[in-house]
């Protein structure tokens, strides 16, 4: 695998985490995949996922804005559930696996609304959260897991860009998928409008947590190499593209200083209201996200 140094660009750690650091991304000259090089050793990366990290965030008290914050977080899970509902009908006999489940709220919603057996995998143990009681939570990495029955639905919501072994993970996940099952993968889109707008201050350059950055072509190539068949590719996702627009503007204004998410809650929702006319066309504008729905090759 050859690296093209002319395509190297950088992401700064402190924009979301407050931790110092500058990390380089390079583009493979053979396959065009963009990835972090060098990267934090796998046994040290957990230090960058503290309780303030978005997917693991425990704080939910933001004063008068708390109801709005909780509604928005629940809306994200509702959008995930609506998206997967277009491709698979879940009931009490179904089995669902979420890789990189974080705080597990999506699985809790799926279990509560469909009765499906919900399993979550994450390397950070958040099993003490009350809603985790209804979830079969596995603390660890995907390659460390063993399952004796296949899953009807496997989801990777913004997990693959964090994974140190994405190709191996997809191949393993294919083996866990039922013959007629579906896998839903959502990641930031490198060839998006927001990347062109913000460049090195694009929120998708969330280093060192994001180790791989995917364009449409490199994402589809990776899933196909894993023996998966593309059912549909979407230029949007359940994660709100507006977050990348808001954070990208904030990163430019802050010029490298960390974004305090607690203080940003009010401006975030005010900006979302102003951007509402644009966001009506989120699914057509290629703003920030992409989703690919796949099945086992030859099973359709």
Predicted regions and their residues:
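Conserved SAM-binding loop and adjacent beta-strand
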Residues: 65-80
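S-adenosyl-L-methionine-dependent methyltransferase catalytic module, highlighting the catalytic core
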Residues: 164-172, 182-298
